[in-house]
Design a protein with these regions (language model features):
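Membrane-embedded helix-loop-helix hairpins and adjacent transmembrane boundary segments
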Residues: 1-580
Length: 580
C-alpha cells in the first residue's frame, strides 16, 4: 500500500450521477402519479395502499444508512466478527413488534405513534414523548455528515450537503409513496456498492479462505465470548440483549418505521413486510462483516488510521475502495453512490416522519384547516426539517465514532419510549401517572449513563480493541512507522458509569417499566372502563400467540372485516370500551 491519494475520475462522476439520477427518476415518477392526492394523510401514509415487498425493502433501506455502510465494517475491523450476533436480535425484535405493537397501531390507523400515548395515557405523556423523538434530529445529522467522511477520500471538495435538495424534492412532490419506491431502488444501489468491494477483495486475495485465515490469525473470528460482564463492549449477551431492546425500540416505537408498516394495504402485508425486512437486515449485516474482514486482510500490517492516513475509522472502507478500485473506472463512483443513496434513504425517512409527527401532534389538534392547506403545511414542514437536519450535520462531527454515537442517541431516545409503549400495550393496570413518570425516570436513567460514559469513558480493558499494526507501512509522504496496538489485559478497576453502549437502551427501557408499574400501584390501577378501545393487549393472549407463532389479531373484532382500520379509528374516538 503506497499511501498515495487517489481521486475520482470523470467516469466515476458519471456513474455517480447516473445512479443517483435513476433514484431521483423513480421518486419523480411516483410523485407525478400521486400529484392529485388531496389530503395530508395520503401525503404522509401513501394512502395505505402499499404492498409488503416494497415496504419491507423500504424498512431495510431506511436503517441501512450511510452510518451503517461505513461504520459496521470499521466496527468489525477493530472489534471482530462477533458483531454478527446482532442478527439474532433482528429476529427477536421483529417477532416482538409484529405480535405486540403492530396489531394495536395498525388497528388504530394512527398517523403518529404518539397519538396512541394520548389515547392510552395523557396529553402530557404524548407531548413529552414527541419532544424525545425530535432529539433524533441528531441521528439524521450523523447520516448527513457520514457521506462527507467518505467523499473526502475520493473528491477534492465536500458535496454531501447537496443531497438534501434531492430528498426534499421527492418529499415535497410525492410524500411517503415516493420515498418508499425510491428506497427500493436505493437499497439495490447500496448492495451493489458493497458487492463491488467484496468481490474485488476476494479476487486480489486469491479467495475468501485467505481473508478468513488472516482474520483468524488476527483474532477477528471471535464468536466464542459469552462473558456476562455488562461493562464489556461486545459479547454475545450485550449484542443479543442490547440489540433486541434497541431494534424493538426502532420497529415498535420509532415513527419512521411504524409509519411504513402502517402504510400497508392490510395487516397481513404489514406483518409480512416486517419479516421480509429481517432478511434484508441479515444480508446487510453479513455484507458489513465480510467487508470488515476484508479491511483487516488488507491492512493487517499497516493500519491507515494509526498511520494518520485517515482521520476516523469510518473512513477506512472508502480508503480501501480508492486503493483497490482506482484502476477500475466507474466502480469507485458506484461505491460512493451507494454511500450517498444510504444517506438519502434515511434522511428522507426521517424528514417525512418528523413532518407527520408535527402535523398530527401539534397542528391538527389545535387548528382546523382544510385538507388543501394541511397538505401545503405538510410539504412546508418537510422543507423546514430538511434545513434543520443539514444544520445538525455540523454537530455530528463532534460526536466521535459514528456507530457508538448512533447507539447512544438510540439509547437515550429509544429506551424510555420502548418502556413506555410496552407498558401501554402489555400492562392494563398502568395509569397515566405511571406512564408519565416512568418515561421521565427512563429518560433520566438513560441520560445519566450517557453522561457517565462521557465523563468516564470505558477503558480499553472493557472495549478490547483488537491488535492493529503499522510496522508494514511504507508511505511516500513520510518516514517508516512501527506502531503496534497491544492486546488488552484484564481490567484492574470496573466503573458502573460505563456499561456497554448497547445497554443504554436496556437501562432506559427497564427503568421506565419498573417505575411506571410502581407509580401505578401506588396511585391506583387503571380501570377497564377507562381504556380507549384497541389500546391494550392482554399479556396472557400476547404470550400464547407469540409462543405459538400465530397472529395476535384475534383479540380484536375483525381488523379487516368491519370496515377496515379507518372505520375502526372513527369508532375508537367515540368509545372507551377495553378490548381485553
Amino acid at each position: 500500500m503506497s499511501g498515495d491519494a487517489h481521486l475520482l475520475v470523470a467516469a466515476d462522476y458519471v456513474v455517480f450521477a447516473v445512479v443517483l439520477l435513476l433514484s431521483a427518476a423513480v421518486g419523480f415518477y411516483y410523485a407525478w402519479r400521486s400529484r392529485k392526492q388531496g389530503t395530508s394523510r395520503d401525503f404522509l401514509t401513501g394512502g395505505r395502499k402499499l404492498n409488503a415487498l416494497a415496504v419491507s425493502m423500504s424498512l431495510t433501506a431506511s436503517y441501512m444508512s450511510s452510518v451503517t455502510v461505513l461504520s459496521n465494517p470499521a466496527e468489525v475491523y477493530r472489534y471482530g466478527a462477533i458483531f454478527g450476533y446482532l442478527s439474532i436480535s433482528y429476529v427477536l425484535a421483529v417477532v416482538y413488534t409484529s405480535e405486540v405493537f403492530l396489531p394495536v397501531f395498525y388497528r388504530l390507523a394512527i398517523n403518529s405513534t404518539y397519538e396512541y400515548l394520548e389515547l392510552r395515557f395523557s396529553r402530557a405523556t404524548r407531548l413529552l414523548a414527541m419532544v424525545i423523538f425530535f432529539f433524533n434530529l441528531l441521528y439524521t445529522g450523523l447520516v448527513i455528515y457520514a457521506p462527507a467522511l467518505a467523499l473526502n477520500q475520493g473528491m477534492s471538495a465536500r458535496v454531501s450537503n447537496s443531497q438534501i435538495c434531492h430528498v426534499l424534492w421527492c418529499l415535497l412532490q410525492g410524500g411517503l409513496k415516493a420515498v418508499v419506491w425510491t428506497d427500493v431502488v436505493q437499497i439495490g444501489i447500496m448492495f451493489a456498492g458493497y458487492m463491488s468491494v467484496i468481490i474485488k477483495c476476494v479476487i486480489l486475495k486469491g479467495g475468501i479462505s485467505t481473508i478468513l485465515s488472516d482474520a483468524q490469525e488476527g483474532g477477528r473470528i471471535n464468536f466464542v465470548d459469552f462473558d456476562i460482564n455488562p461493562l464489556r463492549r461486545h459479547t454475545f449477551w450485550t449484542l443479543v440483549i442490547g440489540g433486541t431492546f434497541g431494534w424493538s425500540a426502532v420497529y415498535g416505537t420509532y415513527q419512521p418505521q411504524v409509519q411504513r408498516y402502517n402504510s400497508c394495504k392490510t395487516i397481513k402485508h404489514a406483518r409480512l413486510a416486517l419479516f421480509i425486512n429481517v432478511l434484508g437486515l441479515a444480508c446487510t449485516l453479513t455484507s458489513s462483516v465480510i467487508s470488515g474482514l476484508c479491511l483487516y486482510s488488507f491492512f493487517k500490517n499497516c493500519d491507515p488510521w494509526k498511520a494518520g492516513q485517515v482521520s476516523s475509522p469510518d473512513q477506512l472502507l472508502p480508503y480501501l475502495v480508492m486503493d483497490i478500485l482506482a484502476d477500475h473506472q466507474g466502480l469507485p463512483g458506484l461505491f460512493f453512490a451507494a454511500v450517498y443513496s444510504a444517506s438519502l434513504s434515511t434522511v428522507s425517512t426521517s424528514i417525512n416522519a418528523m413532518a407527520a409527527v408535527t402535523m398530527e401532534d401539534l397542528i391538527k389538534p389545535r387548528i382546523k384547516l382544510s385538507e388543501k392547506k394541511l397538505l401545503l403545511i405538510s410539504k412546508g414542514l418537510s422543507l423546514f426539517f430538511g434545513i434543520v437536519c443539514v444544520a445538525m450535520a455540523g454537530l455530528a462531527s463532534l460526536m466521535g465514532h459514528m456507530m457508538q454515537a448512533v447507539s447512544i442517541i438510540g439509547g437515550v431516545c429509544g429506551g424510555p419510549l420502548l418502556g413506555l409503549f410496552s407498558l401501554g400495550v402489555l400492562c392494563p393496570f398502568v395509569n397515566s401517572k405511571g406512564g408519565l413518570w416512568g418515561l421521565v425516570a427512563g429518560l433520566a436513567a438513560a441520560v445519566s449513563v450517557t453522561i457517565g460514559e462521557i465523563i468516564s469513558p470505558s477503558p480499553p480493558e472493557m472495549t478490547r480493541p483488537l491488535s492493529l499494526s503499522t510496522e508494514g507501512c511504507n508511505f511516500s509522504s513520510g518516514g517508516s512507522l512501527n506502531w503496534t496496538t497491544p492486546l488488552p489485559t484484564e481490567p484492574s478497576l470496573y466503573t458502573w458509569q460505563s456499561p456497554s453502549y448497547l445497554y443504554f437502551v436496556v437501562i432506559g427501557g427497564l427503568t421506565a417499566i419498573i417505575v411506571g408499574i410502581i407509580i401505578s400501584l401506588l396511585t391506583g390501577k387503571k380501570k377497564r372502563k377507562d381504556f380507549a378501545i384497541g389500546t391494550v393487549i392482554s399479556f396472557s393472549y400476547c404470550f400464547i400467540t407469540t409462543f405459538c407463532f400465530c397472529s395476535s389479531t384475534h383479540h380484536f373484532r375483525g381488523i379487516e372485516g368491519d370496515g377496515g382500520p379507518e372505520a375502526y379509528a372513527n369508532e375508537r374516538r367515540h368509545s372507551f370500551l377495553s378490548p381485553v
